[in-house]
Amino acid sequence: MLPQRVYAKIDLDAICRNIKNAMDKVGKETKVMAIIKTDAYGHGAVPVAKALSEIGCYAFGVATAKEAVVLRKSGIKNPILILGYVFPQDYDDLINYEIMHAVFEYHTAKALSDEAVKLGKTAKIHIKLDTGMGRIGMQPTDESIEEIKKIYSLPNIEINGIFTH
């Protein structure tokens, strides 16, 4: 007898129930961001985002600009944060689609600021910290605080949060 092919059954009700349980535990005053990068880990980012949006999930995290734009073009209105690197040629999409970008150095924020000024819009960002995993991010140092202050003073930049990943 030949073994059966592997398949995955995506149960959106179960996904929603699990996220709702987490949201109930942290309380209504806490905003929850569901990480749905890489097509929601193969579960389908668009249907997962739509279902989670309906139950009150505040925001979504993705890996790339392309993933974020797909969500926007599919009608997702929730805030979207790109957790990884974004190529400069994609900055206009981030700004036009109001997608947040993870920033971990001044020169990236400056380039986003320049593009936002050119477009007459605001670029939304989160500051990414490296809290010990050795991944990309600003170190928790006095120098980083000064760099964040410089980023804060840039025109057409809106810092929406700080996170680690």
Language-model regions, residue ranges each:
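Active-site-proximal beta-alpha core segment in soluble small-molecule metabolic enzymes
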Residues: L2, V6-K9, T30-H165
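Positively charged, low-complexity intrinsically disordered leader regions
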Residues: P3-K25
